[in-house]
Every structure is written in C-alpha cells, then in structure tokens.
Swiss-Prot record:
Belongs to the transposase IS21/IS408/IS1162 family. The gene is nmoT. Residues 3-65 form the HTH IS21-type domain. Pfam families: Mu-transpos_C_2 (PF22483). PROSITE patterns: HTH_IS21, INTEGRASE. GO terms for biological process: DNA integration; DNA recombination; transposition. This is Transposase. Keywords: DNA recombination, DNA-binding, Transposable element, Transposition. Required for the transposition of the insertion element.
Length: 508
C-alpha cells in the first residue's frame, strides 16, 4: 500500500514519467500502468484456499469450545488440553492452529451475542402492592471504634420504589427473617410477591430452569406473611434490576465515607431515618411526585402485617457438665438442672434463647465475633449456678460465674468470707433470689450493710419486712395522758452496797 501511494504521488504530483518511475522502483512498465489505473485501491492478490489439517475436527472442536464456555474458570480445559485430546483422535496439526481456531471462534461468538437479543431487555412495570425485591450487599462501617464488615439487606417496593436498608454482621437465616420483619414494618404492609436471586439463605439447591429446593424456614416465613417468593434465573440480575441499582446507590449514599457509630443498633436507626429522608426528596422517575408520594398511594394496596415472624434458627445442643452450651466458638450458661441433657437453642440476630421440654429456661445476649484471632467468649449468669454452690459452697470463692455479682453482693461477700461458715451463709443469701424479687433482696442486703449488721438473719428480717410491706423504721407512739410518767425514776446504784456487808456465820 505504501509503494502504491509513492507511485501515484510521483506520477500525479511530481509529473514523473512511467520510464523514470520504472527506473526508480525496478518494476515493469505494465505493473506501473496497472497501479496507476487501479486508483486508490490496495493491490489484491489471489490466494488459493488451502485445506487445513484441522478441517475434519472443526465441528468437534467448536462443540468442545461451546461446552467449556459454560464452565467456571477453574473447571475449563486449557488449549493445550484440547490440542492433546484432538491428537488422541488423530489430529496431526500444530497447537498454534488450534489456538488460532479458538480465537476466531470466540470473536465470532462475541459478535453473535452483540447482534442478537442477549444484552437487550424489556422494561418492567408493576401494579401497586404487587411485588418487592430483595438483595444482599457487603459494606464497611466503624462500630465501637472497630472497622467492621457488614452484610447489608436491601428491600425495595417495585411500584413506589420505597426502600429500606439494614445492616447485619452475618448473612444467615435469622438475619434474613429480621430484615423482612423490619422492612414490612417500615413499608406499612406486605406485597403479594417477593423477587430474589438464588441466595443461599433462601435456596438449598438450584435445579434446572425454575426448579428450586427452597429452605423450609424461608418458606415458613413466606407462608406467615402470605407472599409468593419468586427466584431469578442464575446470573440474571436484571430480573430484579431495581434493587440491584439500589445496592449501588446505597453504597454512595450511606457508606461513603465510612460511617462511625457506637453500636450496630445505632447504625440501623440512622439508616432507617436516612432512607425515609431520601424517599421525601428523591423523584420517582416514571410518575409525578417523590418516592414518598407514590408510597402513600401504594400503602392501601399492601396487605396489613399482623405480628412479626418469629424468625429464629433452632439447634439441638447438649449441655456440658459445667452448665454451658456452645455456639459459634462462644459458650452460654444454662441452669444447673439441665447439665448433661439435650436442650433446644433458638438463635435470633441479637439474642440466644434456651428451651427445654417446651419451656423457655433462659436467654442471653448474642455475641458475634468473626475474628478467629481472639478466643471465644463465655457468657455466664451466676443464678444458673446457685444449685451447685448450695451443695458446694466453697466453689463460691473462685467460681468464674460469680465474678460479675452485683456490687452489693460483692461487698457482703468480702465481709462474710472472713467469718467461719461465711461461705454457707453467703450462698443462702444469694439463693434468696430464687424465691424473691432480686431487687428486693439487693435492697435488704444494702440496708443490712448500712446498718452495720450484715448477717443472714438480719437480711432475712429486712427482706420479709420489705415483702410484707411493713415499715423499716420504728413507729412513733402517741401514748394517752394517763400513761405519761410524772416522776421519772432515777438510778441509785448505792443501794447495791448493802449486799457487800460481811455475812454472819452461825454455829453448825
């Protein structure tokens, strides 16, 4: 192409003769004339089609490439493996020819995808109260001066586009149920359909087409709220594009820069408030008015929510001889009467409830620590061990559950343990909380300490007077006039001197 441009420039601009051009280029006159008549077109050469050794295997290789394109990156065969498989079938060509064929096949497939229906979508329209969309995302926040990775639940009404964002530490079933409880509370009702991707908190197994093995507890929640769950095709986020867009918007609105809060509860309260503020100032986009305006129109079409779903996840645990149950590397105490017995552990987002024989026996604040660099925590309730120390009062001195006794009990313990039998007496006083109100027992102990008589008998006396409603201060008596003393008696100790006289001895 460059030589053609030079020949044309010499002839048409510099007016050189064909003879001179032939001398400079070494080409024949006929070739020069042909180039000049060709105009600006590039010279073409007839290249005969040459058969390739890969031609008999082209269909098989195309089928292999199509199959491999549907596999994950780690499961795909390499070009060298495909070349080896072709060689085993009788292919005698080079690896480079196979690699070139694969490149051409990928280019053709890419062009086909760009010119077909894939990548084009149909706009969706929803009726009021028809559906909501749900999705998870990951973001960061500083909770209690520690940078924490959060699992953020996004719920969005498809008609009004009202949305709610709520943060959790884990992406588990109990968190999913809690997110729905709060979303329906904020929305003021329940739509008829829920649109999800194939998240592991809802789907146990993805089948062919629309077949799904839905989690039993998730279906229990959907049945409780009377909505129909609908799951998108795998890798088809555009089927719930509203909430996918909401994930991007929420990251810019709420998590950039990284928010800082003393607790997760404070963060969620702030997120709920900010979401409602965005409802009021964000235009709907397709209808006149803000998101808040359209949401007010949609609320009557939502089914009113009755009571929140009891969204716990239940495990069967065996209580250890030290009256503990284990969950997520942490340990929680249970009453000593359940030691070495199976119990039901109901896990909520913020608490752990222990049930036995159909009755709730205790409850603890849930501890979630995803750092494996720190050991698990043990959460005690000293009341659970009172039955043990009643049999073994000496365990009260160094018992780990009794480190967190109320300050009043700690002060009394320091006094009683200095006396013989103080262990038993202290245990008897602590055991009073099993039959009486704990606050009343604490008040009785506090009054006994302030009176300077911190004994079991005095504490019992004060406690019974508190329980019976009797006054703890002696009453003032208003005696009648007839009983008033006119002459108060005066002490005269000299009269005892008569007893000191010498005794007269009598003869026997």
């Amino acid at each position: 192409m460059a030589l053609l441009s030079v020949i044309r420039r010499w002839h048409f601009r510099e007016h050189l003769s064909i003879r001179e051009i032939c001398r400079r280029t070494g080409l024949s006159r006929n070739t020069i004339r042909k180039y000049l008549r060709a105009g600006g077109a590039e010279p073409k050469f007839n290249v005969p089609e040459r058969p390739s050794k890969l031609d008999p295997f082209a269909d098989r290789l195309s089928a292999w490439l199509k199959t491999e394109s549907k596999k994950s990156r780690k499961q795909k065969r390499t070009m060298k493996q495909l070349h080896s498989d072709l060689v085993s079938l009788g292919y005698e060509g080079s690896y480079n020819r196979v690699a070139a064929f694969a490149r051409e096949w990928r280019d053709d497939r890419q062009r086909e995808l760009q010119t077909t229906g894939r990548g084009t979508f149909v706009p969706l329209a929803f009726e009021p109260g028809e559906a909501f969309q749900f999705d998870w995302s990951e973001d960061w926040a500083i909770i209690g001066n520690e940078r924490t990775k959060l699992q953020v639940a996004h719920t969005k009404l498809s008609y009004s586009r009202a949305f709610i964002v709520r943060a959790y530490l884990l992406q588990t079933h109990e968190m999913l149920f809690d997110a729905h409880n709060h979303a329906f509370r904020v929305f003021g009702g329940i739509p008829g359909r829920g649109i999800y991707d194939n998240m592991r908190t809802a789907i146990d197994k993805v089948g062919r087409g629309k077949e799904r093995d839905v989690n039993v507890r998730f279906m229990a929640m959907a049945s409780h709220y009377v909505f129909e769950p609908e799951f998108c095709n795998p890798a088809s986020g555009w089927e719930k594009g509203q909430v996918e867009k909401n994930v991007q918007d929420a990251r810019h609105r709420f998590f950039q820069p990284v928010p800082r809060f003393p607790s997760l509860e404070a963060l969620n309260d702030w997120l709920e408030q900010r979401c409602k503020e965005f409802w009021a100032k964000t235009p709907h986009g397709q209808m006149r008015g803000t998101i808040a305006d359209i949401w007010v129109e949609e609320v009557p079409a939502l089914m009113p929510a009755s009571r929140p779903f009891d969204g716990f996840v239940e495990y069967t645990k065996r209580v250890t001889p030290t009256c503990l149950v284990h969950l997520e590397r942490n340990r929680y105490s249970v009453p000593a009467s359940l030691a070495n017995r199976p119990v039901s552990l109901r896990v909520y987002p913020d608490r752990v409830v222990v049930a036995a024989e159909g009755q709730i026996v205790c409850e603890h604040r849930r501890v979630i620590d995803r750092s494996h660099d720190r050991p698990g925590q043990t959460i005690y309730d000293w009341r659970h061990y009172l039955a043990v120390v009643q049999r073994k009062p000496g365990a009260l001195r160094n018992g780990a559950p009794f480190v967190e006794l109320p300050d009043v009990f700690r002060t009394l313990q320091q006094y009683l343990l200095k006396k013989p039998g103080g262990d038993r007496e202290m245990v008897d006083i602590l055991a009073l909380v099993l039959q009486h109100d704990e606050q009343a027992v604490l008040s009785a102990v506090d009054m006994a300490l302030r009176s300077g008589v911190p004994t079991k008998t005095h504490v019992l006396n004060l406690l019974h007077r508190l329980v019976d409603g009797k006054s703890l201060t002696p009453p003032t008596l208003d005696a009648p006039q007839a009983l008033t003393l006119t002459n108060e008696p005066k002490a005269n100790v000299e009269r005892y001197d008569t007893l000191r006289k010498t005794e007269v001895r009598h003869a026997s």
